[in-house]
Each structure stands twice: as C-alpha cells, then as structure tokens.
A protein has these predicted regions:
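Residues immediately flanking
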Residues: 42, 124, 151, 271, ...
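Core beta-strand-centered patch of the WYL/Sm-like small regulatory domain
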Residues: 232-308
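Short alpha-helix plus adjacent loop in nuclease-associated cores
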Residues: 149-165
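Short, glycine/acidic-enriched loop or turn micro-motifs at the edges of active sites
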Residues: 44-46, 153, 193
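Acidic two-metal-ion nuclease catalytic site recognized across multiple nuclease folds
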Residues: 6-29, 197-256
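Acidic, Mg2+-coordinating catalytic module of metal-dependent nucleases/exonucleases
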Residues: 117-136, 162-164, 168-227
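Conserved non-catalytic scaffold segment of RNase H-like nuclease domains
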Residues: 6-145, 160, 170-181
Length: 308
C-alpha cells in the first residue's frame, strides 16, 4: 500500500523536476547505487540565516554500493558572539571558534568537497540549505545547484501507520533504528546520523532507483528549498535601489544609505552582497559608522545614493 502510494506520485514529480531543473535532472531509472550522496549539517549562532552565522559545517560523502565514506568537517569563525543558550545546545563556544577559518574559506572548501555531481541531504533541509546559501552569497560565492534530499520529509512519507516513531527528530529516529549515539547537535555526528537514517529508509522501501526519491517529494534543487522573492513584483523604488546596489557591489563603491529601522538613520556603507532569505531581499554591507558588517532589508531602504 505504502509503496504504491509513493509511486503514484512519480510521474507528476518527475515532470516537475524536468521543468524546474532540466540541467540537473537524473532519469527515474538512475540506480541509487550509482549516485554519490553527501549528508551534511550546520551548527549556527541562532535560527535566522540573516541575523545569525554558521559555526560548524560538516558532511559525509558516500555511495550505497560501497562501505567506505569521506568526511568534511570544520568549525567556522562566525565573527559574532555565540549566545550562551545556543552554546548549551551544540557545545560550541567563542573560544572554540576564535581561531577557526572564516566562512569564506570553509564554504569554498565545502563546495569543492560536494562537487556538482552529488545529491545532498540534510534533516529539515530547508534550514541547513538556507544557512549555506546565505553564507555563500554573503562572501560572494555561488551556491551549489545540486539536488537536495530532505531526510525529514522522506521519513514522514515512508514511516506511516503503525510503523511510526514518537516524533521525527533526528535523535528520535536514530534511536528508533538502533544507531543512536552519545553526541547530537554537532555537525559531523548529525551528518553521520542522516547518512544512516537514509540507508534505513531505503531498506524499508526496497527501492533501487532514483524514482522513489522523486516520488516522495523529498527531493528538490538546492535553490528551491529557500523561498525566493519575485524581483519583478518588487515596488519600483526597491528595484531602483537594487540596481544601484548591485552596481556598487560590482564597482566596489560606497553608498550613502537612509534606512528606516526602529529609527530612521543615514550612514555610508560599502555594499558586499544582495542576499535572498525567506522571500525578502537583504543588503550585506560594511558600515563605516559602526565599523562592522551590517544587514539591511531592501524594502526598508528609504534612499540610496552613490557616495564619492
């Protein structure tokens, strides 16, 4: 019953992927044993990809047809304090990341590690994807275009009826399948749990081809896990600001910015990147007044003028 329910969605989901990412699409008959997967996880300073930063990024590259795997793991200097209540969750504090490499270096290395041919996976993928995307855009890197599998969605679709855990948290699922450990909320440990969870879920279905993953709706191109703003529907003044800011980023020029936050303020900034997050556009810029990086929501910019 479950397998037939899943596979009844194959045709529509394959059609969707062909339309939305024709260059990425793998045919439904692609054997899972021929795919390279990368399970990955991020640990952060908080929940907002705009206001917060990545403090650890890890991944496990593997194939179902082989017992060996390769790992990537690095702490990241977030350039901001890690709140105490967040450190209590993942155990990473300011002292641990003080001498860690920058986000630019770690994100570039991670891009090299995953390559363009792998299928990425994460548990609650939208969270991890958004942080990686925003961090990469913030430092001028192009986010990957790989397909991404959400192991949370996959588990929710497959583990139905009587075969259903108390909840779908990664820790609960790891213990449900008998591979739970002592360490959680560290990026490498959680990446390994995601890898093992995926293998268990594949065993349940007995699927050997990519079509099952397509059918569940748990597989999307990287960029589609994050809500993108429709630039064409932006107000005219926002589009004008966007054009000017993109020009300033290219020329590495400065901009005099009037911004409506809690209070209206005017400052000179050096634009670094325009970032999309949760359906809104943001400017990441170096503020000469505060002498630090700041983020501004584009629709709250009152005026933007090139500053000589």
């Amino acid at each position: 019953m479950l397998v037939s329910k899943i596979f009844s969605n194959i045709e529509s989901n394959i059609r969707y992927l062909r339309l939305t990412s024709p260059g990425l699409f793998m045919t439904a008959s692609t054997a899972l044993k021929d795919c390279r997967f990368v399970a990955f996880d991020v640990e952060t300073t908080g929940l907002s990809a705009i206001a917060c930063r990545v403090v650890e990024l890890s991944g496990v590259s593997f194939r179902l047809s082989r017992a060996d795997s390769q790992t990537f793991s690095s702490l990241v200097n977030p350039g901001q304090p890690i709140p105490f209540e967040v450190s209590r969750i993942h155990g990473i504090d300011d002292a641990m990341v003080k001498d860690a490499p920058s986000a630019r270096q770690v994100m570039a290395d991670f891009n090299d590690f995953i390559g363009s041919d792998s299928i990425l996976m994460a548990h609650n993928a939208a969270f991890d994807v958004e942080f990686v995307k925003v961090e990469m855009e913030r430092v001028g890197l192009v986010p990957p275009a790989n397909l991404v599998l959400d192991s949370l969605t996959l588990a929710q679709v497959i583990m139905d009826g009587d075969f259903r855990p108390a909840n779908f948290k990664l820790k609960t699922l790891a213990e449900f399948f008998g591979f739970g450990g002592d360490e959680y909320h560290r990026a490498l440990a959680d990446s390994i749990y995601v890898q093992k969870l995926f293998c268990e879920l594949i065993k349940i279905t007995g699927a050997g081809d990519l079509d099952m993953l397509v059918a569940t709706g748990a597989l999307k191109p990287f960029g589609q896990w994050v809500k993108q703003p429709d630039k064409e529907s932006l107000p005219e003044h926002v589009r004008a600001h966007l054009s000017l800011l993109e020009s300033a980023i290219t020329s590495r020029g400065a901009v005099k910015l009037t911004y409506q936050g809690e209070f209206k303020s005017t400052r000179t900034v050096k634009p670094q990147a325009v970032i999309a997050s949760r359906g809104s556009l943001y400017l990441s810029a170096y503020c000469t007044r505060s002498r630090a990086e700041r983020t501004f929501r584009l629709d709250r910019i009152v005026e933007a003028v090139l500053h000589n």
